[in-house]
């Protein structure tokens, strides 16, 4: 069996003619790592203070849950985190292999990703700064409908069945100027997806079991902040009440998103998707949905989608969202802090929200069932504190709501059903 290796990369004093096997013989560019087929237990160390300009790190078909973890991290005692400035390089072609749950969503096209994990498992990436900027001349070019999608970190599951143990820790991802409109391309700060396999009968469904994203600072990204798990198998989750076995066969499991700070996301902040019992806790979403307005969201064509909330699950079963803090989400057709969206058994507890322009909480449409909102605190959320949007049921109990004069407790024209128990609604005095 081949022995694992530690590779060193330094933009400051490396040389691509070196062997990369020691600090004194470090590689200079990330391209040298892209050329290597990493094996279980390999480590890639990037020197603090290094800046990898117009570079990217793309790993494919590596890692094994039955072997040691691959790790990519910083080394050195002093200096800033190693920084990858991709600037629209690292282009790959994304294709779900099918249309998505709404026919207007774009499902294929070019994407620029600073870090791409394509059919990679059992990997830890930490202690890196990432940007993927576009130097646009004016708002018309920024808002262009065909602008290329960009990602800080993208992950794809396709031809290896279930991918296990992908961990992202202490990443500073900012200034990722992706497409304003594309919701389900790998487009934003961190975005993970599953594509149609070449031979699903042989490999099994493409899915994730074991994703942990923690301690990351995601700032000024478009469109999504952190999204885990949009899937080509979306049709298997069309029912109102969702069966656990469907998730174990086609969906995602053991998804943990915690201790992250998302600021100025163009659209939504944090969303697990098609996941069984995902845990989303101790996150902060600050001033998100900044591009969901007529000034920027100008040319959606058939994509529609000028909607975003902050922290919410999509088509999940028994999602738990707790100890999160959301403020200043910008007004759009949604614009609230939290949203139980077309899922079964979503639970929000011990969360805080304040000054969100679309309100505190939404129960979204007829497929949002068996959801609860308990022991949360809302302070001066606007437009309407609660948004029951045609949902058949919701249990809202033991919450405290501080409501500004003139702001309705239930958003206007909302007629979903809620059971209210032991809540405190306190008027904010002028």
Language-model region placement:
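Short, T/G/N/S-enriched strand-turn elements that build extracellular solenoid repeat scaffolds
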Residues: 31-37, 52-63, 83-85, 274, ...
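Soluble non-cytosolic domains of exported or imported proteins
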Residues: 24-27, 119, 162
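Right-handed parallel beta-helix
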Residues: 69, 121-132, 161-177, 201-224, ...
């Amino acid at each position: 069996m081949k022995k694992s290796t530690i590779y060193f990369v330094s933009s400051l004093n490396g040389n691509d003619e070196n062997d990369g096997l020691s600090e004194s013989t470090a590689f200079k560019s990330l391209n040298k790592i892209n050329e290597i087929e990493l094996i279980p237990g390999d480590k890639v160390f990037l020197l603090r203070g290094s800046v990898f300009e117009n570079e990217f790190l793309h790993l494919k078909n590596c890692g094994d849950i039955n072997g040691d973890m691959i790790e990519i991290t910083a080394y050195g005692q002093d200096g800033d985190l190693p920084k990858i400035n991709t600037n629209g390089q690292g282009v790959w072609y994304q294709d779900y292999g099918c249309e998505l749950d709404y026919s207007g969503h774009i499902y294929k096209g070019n994407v620029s990703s600073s870090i791409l994990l394509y059919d990679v498992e059992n990997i830890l990436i930490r202690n890196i700064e990432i940007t993927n900027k576009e130097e646009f001349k004016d708002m018309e070019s920024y808002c262009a409908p065909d602008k290329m999608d960009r990602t800080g970190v993208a992950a794809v599951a396709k031809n290896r069945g279930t991918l296990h143990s992908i961990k992202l820790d202490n990443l500073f991802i900012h200034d990722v100027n992706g497409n304003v409109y594309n919701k389900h391309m790998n487009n934003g700060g961190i975005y993970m997806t599953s594509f149609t396999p070449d031979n699903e009968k042989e490999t099994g469904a493409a899915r994730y079991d074991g994703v942990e994203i923690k301690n990351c600072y995601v700032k000024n990204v478009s469109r999504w902040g952190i999204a885990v798990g949009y899937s080509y198998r979306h049709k298997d989750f069309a029912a109102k009440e969702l069966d656990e076995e469907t998730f174990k066969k086609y969906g995602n499991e053991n998804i943990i998103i915690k201790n992250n700070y998302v600021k100025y996301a163009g659209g939504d902040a944090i969303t697990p998707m098609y996941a069984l019992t995902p845990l989303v806790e101790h996150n902060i979403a600050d001033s998100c949905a900044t591009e969901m307005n007529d000034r920027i969201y100008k040319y959606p064509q058939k994509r529609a989608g000028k909607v975003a909330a902050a922290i919410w699950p999509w088509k999940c079963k028994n999602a738990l969202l707790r100890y999160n803090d959301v403020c200043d989400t910008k007004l759009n057709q949604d614009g609230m802090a939290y949203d139980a969206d077309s899922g079964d058994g979503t639970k929000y507890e011990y969360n805080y929200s304040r000054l969100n322009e679309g309100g505190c909480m939404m129960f979204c449409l007829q497929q949002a069932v068996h959801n609860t909102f308990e022991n949360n605190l809302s302070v001066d959320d606007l437009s309407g504190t609660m948004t029951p949007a045609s949902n058949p049921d919701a249990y809202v109990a033991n919450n405290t709501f501080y409501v500004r004069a003139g702001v309705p407790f239930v958003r206007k024209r909302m007629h979903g059903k809620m059971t209210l128990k032991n809540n405190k609604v306190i008027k904010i005095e002028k």
